């Protein structure tokens, strides 16, 4: 099957090759595999936690966070940085916001937002490890990447052309609710913490989607990446605060 390999190649830096250029339909079907890719990343983080069992918690949290960023190649952090710059510099104007978002250069707002996000993730991750709740490392990337197909299925895509447009146009919408429902049910097997994380991430999803609709009339690839990073951070903070 080529769809899961497309999802792996796009969302991770794992060595995955494709037999050829995928069709738009295959690209669209790959969205169904985003939650599974998130689960795989979560399992890798949990495995790292188990292998680092004798490492001091502070060092372990730093290593796991670096691995977390490295496995995705910083793809979603880049989207968050672009979104932060554009949101502040756009002054409420949709066209200006989209133009700034497309600029590859990062301004001071992007740097500040990234530093704050990584600082919050590190502190919350450290609290989680100190409480002996490393199992939730499985949940966070899984939950974050499950929100991407939900966003693209419910929100207009405002930047015509490219990979994002193919994802939206060819997303298997009839199958998506079943796929997401199955993953959510599996997440809840992790206990009450999973329910807290899920509720937090969904609340952030509703708030951010509304903000995107008001400012841009839809979403872009960058804002999807921003959603993922913010949802992971919010869920991680909620877990840490609930311990």
Swiss-Prot record:
It is found in: Cell inner membrane. Its EC number is 2.7.8.26. Its cofactor is Mg(2+). GO terms for cellular component: plasma membrane. It catalyses: alpha-ribazole + adenosylcob(III)inamide-GDP = adenosylcob(III)alamin + GMP + H(+); alpha-ribazole 5'-phosphate + adenosylcob(III)inamide-GDP = adenosylcob(III)alamin 5'-phosphate + GMP + H(+). Pathway: Cofactor biosynthesis; adenosylcobalamin biosynthesis; adenosylcobalamin from cob(II)yrinate a,c-diamide: step 7/7. One of its GO terms (biological process) is cobalamin biosynthetic process. Pfam families: CobS (PF02654). It is a multi-pass membrane protein. Joins adenosylcobinamide-GDP and alpha-ribazole to generate adenosylcobalamin (Ado-cobalamin). Also synthesizes adenosylcobalamin 5'-phosphate from adenosylcobinamide-GDP and alpha-ribazole 5'-phosphate. This is Adenosylcobinamide-GDP ribazoletransferase. It comes from Ectopseudomonas mendocina (strain ymp). The gene is cobS.
């Amino acid at each position: 099957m080529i769809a899961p390999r497309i999802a792996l190649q796009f969302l991770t830096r794992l060595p995955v090759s494709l037999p050829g250029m995928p069709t738009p339909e295959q690209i669209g079907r790959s969205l169904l595999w985003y939650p599974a890719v998130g689960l795989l990343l979560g399992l890798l983080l949990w495995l790292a936690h188990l292998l680092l069992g004798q490492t001091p918690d502070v060092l372990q949290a730093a290593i796991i966070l670096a691995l977390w960023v490295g496995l995705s190649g910083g793809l979603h952090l880049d989207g968050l940085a672009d979104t932060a710059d554009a949101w502040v510099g756009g002054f409420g104007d949709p066209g200006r916001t989209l133009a700034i978002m497309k600029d590859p250069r990062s301004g001071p707002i992007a740097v500040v937002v990234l530093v704050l996000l990584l600082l919050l993730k590190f502190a919350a991750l450290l609290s989680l490890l100190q409480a002996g709740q490393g199992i939730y490392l499985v949940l966070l990337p899984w939950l974050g990447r499950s929100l991407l197909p939900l966003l693209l299925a419910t929100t207009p895509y405002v930047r015509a052309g490219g990979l994002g447009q193919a994802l939206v146009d060819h997303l298997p919408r009839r199958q998506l609710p079943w796929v997401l429902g199955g993953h959510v049910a599996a997440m809840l097997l992790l206990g009450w913490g999973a329910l807290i994380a899920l509720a937090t991430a969904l609340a952030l999803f509703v708030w951010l989607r509304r903000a995107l609709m008001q400012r841009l009339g839809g979403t872009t690839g960058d804002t999807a990446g921003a959603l993922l990073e913010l949802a992971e951070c919010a869920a991680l903070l909620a877990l840490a605060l609930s311990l």
